């Protein structure tokens, strides 16, 4: 048994040593070789040692086998002399024959009237023949010199053309003004005729209704043991399009904004019968009165219908009761009686 253990121990040690040796060998093989150990490094080293003592071979132009020549030193202050251009006798002869152009006289006549921007004016600006030829491009042929007399003739021609253009423009404007004047006169005549044709509106005075012959009354009273508060009445009046006015009471007008004739009114049921809008929060009453006089402005049936609906709406908003002129509950019989009174006073 001891021999078997010894054998296994020896085999294990051998295996461990083999693994370590194989690992070091693998690591060393993967490392890159240095330039000294590479075969090309020895080759370059030998070439360098061999070339130090041997003379370089150069060709007839002074370049060696690699195409490298000897070093040349140039002076820094050596100036570059441009080459003289080739002599051209034709250009010299043409330069002598070319005279210097004479600048023409620019004549700017003062305009007789203000020009309109919409009309395009012709361009009569003078240019010397030399400038025109330069604008068109160079020519191989010789150019004729410009004489002072020729420039003066051109200036006179320019003045004549400008004067003719201004005269033509003035004539066109006069003709246009003559065309516009009858048109404007016709427009003024049409406006005057239209004003004459308009009928003059004469405000007619409103028909006087005379003395009232009957009064339709509706009461809106609080329930037994209760009061109507002014803080609740005021917003209800404004919602129903009533406006505070004459006799310190609220009125309903033809226009909902409070303009026009009065259709019917609301008064306090308790004496003195008026309201104080500034102290409505401290105000309380047993009820209010809707009343409409007959005859009235507009349709009496329509006005009464509006008054009845307003009274019912107010009673619903403040939890009150609608009564007739005798302070009796409103019913169908009372309604028919009111309609009969309206027809009788129509």
From Swiss-Prot:
Belongs to the ZipA family. The chain crosses the membrane at residues 7-27. It is a single-pass type I membrane protein. It holds the Pfam family ZipA_C. Residues 116-146 are annotated as: Disordered. Residues 1-6 are periplasmic. GO terms for biological process: division septum assembly; FtsZ-dependent cytokinesis. One of its GO terms (cellular component) is cell division site. This is Cell division protein ZipA. It comes from Shewanella sp. (strain ANA-3). Interacts with FtsZ via their C-terminal domains. Keywords: Cell cycle, Cell division, Cell inner membrane, Cell membrane, Membrane, Transmembrane, Transmembrane helix. It is found in: Cell inner membrane. Residues 28-346 are cytoplasmic. NCBIfam families: septum_zipA. The keyword Transmembrane applies. Coiled coil: none annotated. The keyword Transmembrane applies. The lineage of its organism: Bacteria, Pseudomonadati, Pseudomonadota, Gammaproteobacteria, Alteromonadales.
């Amino acid at each position: 048994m001891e021999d078997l253990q010894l054998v296994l121990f020896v085999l294990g040690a051998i295996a461990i040593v083999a693994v370590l040796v194989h690992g070091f060998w693998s690591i060393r093989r993967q490392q890159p070789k240095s330039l000294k150990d590479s075969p090309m490094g020895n080759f370059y080293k030998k070439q360098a040692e061999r070339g130090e003592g041997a003379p370089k071979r150069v060709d007839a132009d002074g370049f060696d086998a690699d195409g490298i020549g000897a070093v040349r030193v140039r002076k820094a202050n050596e100036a570059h002399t441009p080459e003289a251009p080739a002599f051209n006798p034709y250009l010299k002869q043409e330069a002598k024959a070319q005279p210097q152009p004479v600048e023409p006289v620019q004549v700017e006549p003062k305009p007789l009237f203000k020009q309109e921007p919409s009309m395009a004016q012709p361009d009569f600006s003078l240019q010397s023949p030399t400038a025109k030829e330069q604008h068109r491009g160079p020519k191989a042929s010789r150019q004729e010199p410009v004489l002072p007399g020729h420039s003066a003739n051109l200036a006179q021609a320019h003045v004549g053309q400008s004067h003719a253009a201004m005269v033509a423009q003035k004539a066109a404007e006069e003709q246009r003004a003559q065309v516009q004047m009858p048109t404007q006169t016709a427009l003024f005549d049409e406006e005057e005729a239209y004003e004459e044709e308009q009928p003059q509106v004469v405000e007619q005075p409103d028909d006087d209704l005379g003395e009232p012959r009957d009064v339709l009354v509706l009461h809106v009273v609080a329930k037994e043991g209760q009061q109507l508060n002014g803080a609740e009445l005021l917003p209800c009046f404004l919602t129903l399009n009533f406006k505070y006015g004459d006799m310190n009471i609220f009125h309903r007008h033809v226009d909902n904004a409070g303009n026009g004739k009065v259709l019917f009114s609301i008064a306090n049921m308790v004496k003195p019968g008026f309201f104080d809008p500034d102290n409505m929060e401290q105000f309380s009453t047993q009820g209010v009165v809707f009343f409409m006089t007959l005859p009235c402005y507009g349709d009496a049936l329509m006005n009464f219908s509006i008054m009845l609906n307003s009274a019912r709406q107010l009673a619903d908003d403040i939890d009150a009761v609608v009564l007739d002129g005798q302070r009796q509950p409103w019913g169908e019989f009372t309604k028919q009686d009111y309609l009969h009174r309206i027809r009788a006073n129509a």
